[in-house]
Amino acid sequence: MNEQTQYLTNSLVEQLALMAMKDYGLTMVDALALVYHSQWYEKVTDTETGLYFQSPAYNYRLLRHEVAFGKVN
């Protein structure tokens, strides 16, 4: 993963954690744990998926689906 890709991924993690805090009433630590321990995170760090280049809203929908159903759609 190059520096630009890492920056985009880190930005997504931050934004998704903030969204999860708001929607699920989580602390920052719990929200980050949710994101970092998700199947979504495995996929976003795989540059071949291109998820790092998608919008935070799109990625958050994937994370919410995983929380609700146990897997990324």
Segments predicted by a language model, with ranges:
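C-terminal alpha-helical interaction appendages
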Residues: 1-73
